[in-house]
Amino acid sequence: MMRHNLSGTGIAIVTPFLEGGGVDFIGLEKLLNHIIEGGVDYIVVLGTTGESVVLSADEKIAVTNFVKETVDGRKPLVMGIGGNNTCAVSDTIKNTDLSGYDAILSVSPYYNKPTQEGIYQHYKALSANSPLPIILYNVPGRTSSNISAETTLRLANDFDNIIAVKEASGDMYQIMKIIKYRPEGFLVISGDDGLTLPMIYMGADGVISVVGQAYPKEFSNMVRYALEGNQKVANKLHLSLIHI
């Protein structure tokens, strides 16, 4: 059921700020209602787009609680929890109130440039400490290290609570390899708005989008039509959005 609920269009929401530097909760409420009314399938909080790395611990708690209360069960919620310190990320997962959330999105370790075995061991530790399903997040343009197809597939096969990968490598050969050899039920999610349609046509399950929060109806319709096999309408919507 959870795997099904996280297909389609997820939105990695921004964290709006006031001029003085605090979180703009009025703006955040408007954004949440806007994307829900636009028909998106689920919402991702504290991802890269949400500027999680610059939020204080108190701000993260305030934002995740506010989102949970505002959404109030209308859409599944995913919380971003990641970092390059395996012990620290594991402790954060164990000590965070995850009630009301359906999964964790965890970016691969950055800066340290771990080996593939190091990446595997990192996620193995997170899997052991997480009460929620985990979505791997591969974005080598930001982390400086790629999760190879082999490592993604190894994690997908070895740990039942690692249920998906958000793939933002831009490497279509790698992505197709994951799609071809993934275990049943493992989701492949686009992490690149511009590659969403070709990835779905290759067998991917949807997207965690940024631009979709500005155009939630158009973007979620594009994904929905593509997943249903209506390429003509999906292509038309894609071309109308490609300039953004």
Identify the meaning behind each predicted range.
Residues 142-239:
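Catalytic alpha/beta core domains of metabolic enzymes, predominantly
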Residues 242-244:
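Conserved small/polar residues in nucleotide/adenosyl-binding loops
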Residues 1-2, 239:
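Intrinsic low-complexity, intrinsically disordered segments enriched in polar/basic residues
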Residues 3-11, 15-144:
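Active-site beta->alpha loop and helix N-cap motifs at the rims of alpha/beta catalytic domains
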